[in-house]
Amino acid sequence: MILALAMLIAGILLLIKGADWLVEGSSSLAKRFGVSDLMIGLTVVAFGTSMPELLVNIVSSVEGANDIAIGNIVGSNIANILLVLGIASIIRNVAVKTSTVWNEIPLALLAVLVLQLMANDSIIDHYPVSELSRSDGLAFLAFFLIFLWYVAKMRRREDEIENGFVERGVPVSIGFVSIGLGLLLLGGKLTVDGAIDIASLLGISQAFIGLTIVAIGTSLPELVTSVLAAVRKKADIAVGNVVGSNIFNVFWIMGVGTIIHPVRLDPALNADLFVAILATVVLFIAVHTGHVHRRIFLFWRQRQEHVIGRTDGVIMLLLYVAYLGYLVWRG
């Protein structure tokens, strides 16, 4: 058990550090070849920070750990909203851009809705099993290309800001990229193997490990980024970071992962997909009312500004704790 836990922790740490070095090396190379900070942010950084979830998804799919593959994505999306934004909004009220409210949050909701529909072949088409096939993966990637087009269009409307990407020598940059990729591959393998061993030793489901420990571990970069953004009074970055990550998780990571290896869905995971949908709806309500409970139990009270308040943050964290309690009860 100690060895399995050490493998899991080491794997998550390697994933985080590997992604960091991959982004640093790739950004440096792009900068040296004249790529703008805007395009580096849209491509290198965005893709690099999603690499931990991608590697875990690919390794677990190839090794037949389907519950970890899907559980990591769904659990990460739930943790990003209820845990990450919950903590960030408790630290400081989180202001949300209008484009995020009306475009990106609904797109994040669309992503989890599409995931649930595509992952339920047995219910919708009465197939013997439910599976995310390679054709589903291609559809996810098609949605992802539309999302990239939207992001590029939105970012070009804004003034390009110097993001502080460091330009290093080519050999050093290649070294960062190579080591980063190596750490990601090793970290993904250790994380999945450790999670499988822990589930086996404790007699609990792989889905539970994927939805909790692995999901929270791969969400740590988003948590750190969002908390620091809240502390530095740039809380709008926190929401964009989380919502963008959730869209990436479904359309990009599930798309690539299922093309490499189809993934079967345990019907029990439908409950977790529903929680992911509910969490996104709660976020949408929060940015409109400022107080989730007023919207649910009384009536719609539209605010002129879009803010996630401290009360909302507390409610989100309580919902996440309740969800974890449900997972423990379910086993």
Model-assigned labels for residue ranges:
Residues 1-331:
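Hydrophobic alpha-helical segments, chiefly the membrane-spanning helices
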